[in-house]
Amino acid sequence: MRQGSTACVFLLATQTWSQHHWSQHKAAFLLRVLESLTDQLAKLGVPLQILDAPNFDDATGHLLKFSREIGAKKLFFNREYPLDEKVRDERVRNSLEENGIECEPHDSFLVFPPNSILKDDGHPYSVFTPFKRKWLAKAEGEGLRSLPCPRPQQSRVLETKIPGEILSTRANFGQNLWPGNHKHAGDLLETFLNGKIDRYHNERDFPATDGTSKLSPYLSLGVISPRECLERAQTLQRTNSINPNDGIETWVSELIWRDFYTHVLAQNSRISRGRAFKAETDKMQWNVNEEWFERWAKGETGFPIVDAGMRQLNTTGWMHNRLRMITSQFLTKHLFIDWRRGEKYFLSRLVDGEFAANNGGWQWSASTGTDAVPYFRMFNPLRQSERFDPDGSFIREQIPELIDANPKFFANPTAQNDLFSSYPSPMIDLKEERERTLTRWKRFNQTLS
């Protein structure tokens, strides 16, 4: 707005989003975000034009036509880092610049954009811990500060129109769970920083406890900036002379993981093509068992903590991070089903689905990714249940069939068969499947040597 009269435009690429496995929750959440953004921009005298460009291939023509209609001299846009998005942006930029319209990209999706944090030899990091050290040093040295809100401009008369449906879902789908406005995101951040963050390092792994920020959907669509989150956390850290900063440091680490996985994605195009970061693991022969996959997806495995996590995902569009690790390891380690199937399923359900973070998490669990868990490390869902849902509060909340179950049964679900006949028996023997997976990995590694 400092460079002249400004209009905003957003492209609805509904067909591409469907191909990219966007969930109904995310599509509806986006509509609510756009509705709220329209009101926010109107207060600044800035119109928002919503264009229906079903495929990324349509973006160039729609933006060029719109730019000509309003006499635009310059296009400002935020980069996205998956391969399809990078190709789309490059095509748009080339076309507009060939037609005399300057383009200026920005990077607001992350705290620090890809290739801004590199090793001393100029190569990208593939291990998180040294990446984190350099990230923290850069954050401390740069002293991030939020920009003031611009002054209102003289409004340009443009029609603002938002289609009523995306991917066969309306904007009110999941509205009570995920209001789509910056004020709500700001309130969540305020509530988190004013108390929960002090306990975050101790409570974040317990799904029955409201111990996380719940900001991931708002970060995923840019409703709130990760830099704003970091700035607020840094301010709190500097003024927090009474309480230890363990919670703040742990939460900031989650922002760093988000940057890390996106950097890895941007620097390795094979990941966007459905390939593993560890190229040799693309040769792994995974189980193909539709019945097992369907039982996992529906939350009917017979392992309560796994089923509770999957039912939370299917119902709300969100899953606690500890449960994301438990359920993904169960699929890739105990069922030995291809991580890509789970990755796509999560994206098709998550309101906060981000390709890089979701892919990074799945490849971590499957031992195919960068800085991944070793193949022999497998979360035992029964021990995880004992540790992180000891009284079964979360399990009972998500699985009505187990509302009256004794917590001791959650660590031994075979004992429930007679009392809780509506809940399925365990679908596998954990010990047997663990041994099978270890054998498969050992044999696979031998083929590489």
Describe the predicted segments one by one.
Residues G122-T281, F388-D389, S393-S449:
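Glycine/tryptophan-enriched, flexible segments
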Residues K26, L30, K298, P426, ...:
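Residue-level preference for long, well-ordered alpha-helices that form the structural scaffold
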Residues D210, K214-R396:
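Active-site-proximal binding-pocket segments
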Residues H21, F76, F293, S421-P424:
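Short coil/turn segments at secondary-structure junctions
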Residues M1-G143, S241, R311, T439-F444, ...:
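Trp/Phe/Arg-rich N-terminal binding region typifying the photolyase-homology
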Residues L30, H182, A208, G299-G302:
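Generic alpha-helical segment signature
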Residues K65, K183, D307, M325, ...:
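A broad detector of short, well-ordered amphipathic alpha-helices
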